[in-house]
Amino acid sequence: MEACCCSSSSVPSASILATGAGLRRRFSPAGAGGGGRAVAVAAGRPIRASAALLAAPAPRRRGGVVVRAVFERFTERAVKAVVFSQREARGMGDETVAPHHLLLGLVAEDRSPLGFLASGVRVERAREACRAAVGKEGLAQAPVGLATDVPFSGASKRVFEAAVEFSRNMGCNFISPEHIALGLFNLNDPTTNNVLKSLGVDSSQLAKQALTRVQGELAKDGREPVGLSSFKVREKFTPGGGKSAIVKYSNKNKEKSALALFCLDLTMRASGGLIDPVIGRKDEIERVVQIICRRTKNNPILLGEAGVGKTAIAEGLAHKIANGDVPIFLVGKRILSLDVALLMAGAKERGELEARVTSLIREVRKAGDVILFIDEVHTLIGSGIAGRGSKGAGLDIANLLKPALARGELQCIASTTLDEHRLHFDKDKALARRFQPVLVNEPSQEDAVKILLGLREKYETYHKCKYTLESINAAVYLSARYIADRHLPDKAIDLIDEAGSRARMESFKRKKEEQCSILSKSPDEYWQEIRAVQNMHEVALTNKVKYSLNQNDQEDAVDIELVGEDKTSPASMLSTSTDKPSLVGSEEIARVTSLWSGIPVQQLTADERKLLVGLDDELRKRVIGQDDAVLAISKAVKRSRVGLNDPDRPIATLIFCGPTGVGKTELTKALAASYFGSESATVRLDMSEYMERHAVSKLIGSPPGYMGFGEGGTLTEAVRRKPFTVVLLDEIEKAHPDIFNILLQIFEDGHLTDSQGRRVSFKNTLIVMTSNVGSTSISNGKRSIGFQTQTDTEEKSYAAMKSLVMEELKAFFRPELLNRIDEVVVFHPLEKTQMLAILNIMLQEVKGRILALGIGLEVSDSMKDLISQHGYDKSYGARPLRRAVTQLVEDVISEAILSGQFKPGDTIMVDTDATGKPCLSRLNDQTVQLSDPTPTL
């Protein structure tokens, strides 16, 4: 008979949530008819969780009170509890939802195993107690109409108002059933108290449990419950003998002001020594003080690139104020740094952010001694508009600050970069005129050294190390030369910081290794060290006793040695050696610079010095017959590695001229493999891909409005990511002439600006261009140079050939391009004797590929002569030789392997038969050791 009454299991949660969602849509402010007119909502509709929860009663409908609100902040559980209470009221035949109905709804919603708020009370038992309290024992009445049409009584309204107030004081952005329960217990309703008394439940214990649950919900979200400790629960005895819980909110501590919440006092931190000292910048700080002392528009804005020290100027002024080294009208001022992110965080309701800003302005005006420092001030422009509705709502923070800034009521020091200032402030002239610009330039290297010397003590204390003067100078010099995309002093400070961190890590590793070495020693070795140390100290003690002036001195010396004997044990010696601060020198700074930039700037090791000395011979192993080119490129690398090259230009700019197939590109690959570690270290651009005029944009990036804008250029992006590399511009004469205009500033100044406005440094690149200009003259040899005789030396012949090639280069390239090239290297045509050496290199590559299949390869001399005969062409260089190797060796071997003539472990002998054709045979006396006997075929 009580089917109409609600229980926790009788109503599906999905239908209840659908009811709540429908109520939200139906009675939201946007959907209210009449453009915001008060809408008469059915009495049983869910209510809005706000401070103005219940408005004045509207005309009655079905004998109830009309509620104008929606469930904007009610949780799903709170919606369920309200709907359950309405159905309980309908089941009991009541016309309104009274507080005891709310109690039944809360009990029905709480499905925990321990019952309602861990009291063990279930909904069936609570329903019986409630009927007995109101004198309606017996069968339930048949429901008439919808359960959600039941209105709320005035007492229930006060419960909801109290729940909203509890939620606000607790710092919650939601209203849960626990908040409703606290409001219910705080109401002191007689019927509710009688129900709880009959159930044998203490309301004060229930209130404490509700507070605990709220705290747990906030902890799950990682939030600190604001003001939760200010709630006190006490018991109050009712006239009928019952008890009710009174939950009081006592906020004795004064609420934090907006300045305390959103600002950081730089002056106080400077007084406590929590801010690094500011070295230099005297002129900039003086200019800032002059602007601050103006009557109106006394707001300086610091403009400069990232890392030049804009924030340090504000901190320097805070130091001066803390030390009293300012004019009399600035004494007692405070510089507060505004945290814009903290100011905006959590302001999701309309008007909340504006209220914070106006409160901040009001407190600054009231204090009278506050100077706000807003770092990255461009973030204020547009803040507060984005993300608020379809078209945005609320005022811009910058617009809120304009009146106070113009009248001088709000003093502000702002900072931003030049690019951000141009992007944001140039569009808002009204805001820009309220700030007076102070340009902060990058300090010179001398000033940067002074700054680092002033900061050295701070970093030495933190990293437990010592910085030498050479390390400070090296940090400034190396960062200025090899880290081009950052600015001083920021990049130099980062170098010493990371070098100190590295030194501390190395010290820890050494300590662990020494400890492990002591533990790994045998007992005999350990005691031998102890006896050796004891013998040394006995000798020292004997000498002190022997040369003491009197007996008392002897006794003192003995006592001193005996007391200090424990300090000479191996363990104490280990701790003493490891506690000694590490020394950071220029080599450590150079090593960090190399790790950072990818450029080897540390001192030459023995292996690297040996590699550089033998670089010529290493390159000649791969490039045959081009000694002049090998010498030119190796000299450039050696000059750069020692540090004698011009720091404002690339390592070298070379152009290789010669006929096709003589090794121009191969020499560049050989250099990358020998010194740079891999052939992939080469940035190769085939200039035949840049034959059109519009293809110039491929190098530096597409301009705005074109596809690919923002992706960067092929050349600039490759060098920006890998500054220490070889740039190969292959077949340069095939590119469009406009390409040469791009290359001019690279060759001369060592930098190039891409489409994004970023300057890319080419100062650590080796630029090589290959060209076939003059190849015809080189191939013709003496026939082209008619004045030569048989008695001419090789040097004269090469010089004459080079001069002839230069004439053709001057006819093809512009003078301003040729004038920026360091050296023009002319490659010799390959002779037949040189072809045999090149053939051996090619056959070694073929052997390596066949060996991967588990098969060896040998080639006879007669076969080599046959390949050289077929592959030699003076006009085409070594490329015909490669084709001959493919046709006479690789094709024949591949056919034999596929036909099953050879298997893994065999060695193939390639020879010529009686007719002079290639033939294959198996060498049985030679085997190949296989790592994997399964062939890859």
From Swiss-Prot:
Pfam families: AAA, AAA_2, AAA_lid_9, Clp_N, ClpB_D2-small. One of its GO terms (cellular component) is chloroplast. Keywords: ATP-binding, Chaperone, Chloroplast, Nucleotide-binding, Plastid, Repeat, Transit peptide. The keyword Aminoacyl-tRNA synthetase does not apply. Residues 259-513 are annotated as: I. Residues 584-775 are annotated as: II. Residues 81-137 are annotated as: Repeat 1. CDD domains: AAA, RecA-like_ClpB_Hsp104-like. Residues 81-217 form the Clp R domain. Highly expressed in stems, culms and leaves. Residues 1-80 form a transit peptide. Residues 152-217 are annotated as: Repeat 2. It is found in: Plastid, Chloroplast. SMART domains: AAA (SM00382), ClpB_D2-small (SM01086). Coiled coil: none annotated. PROSITE patterns: CLP_R, CLPAB_1, CLPAB_2. ATP binds at residues 304-311, 658-665. Molecular chaperone that may interact with a ClpP-like protease involved in degradation of denatured proteins in the chloroplast. Belongs to the ClpA/ClpB family. ClpD subfamily. This is Chaperone protein ClpD2, chloroplastic. It comes from Oryza sativa subsp. japonica.
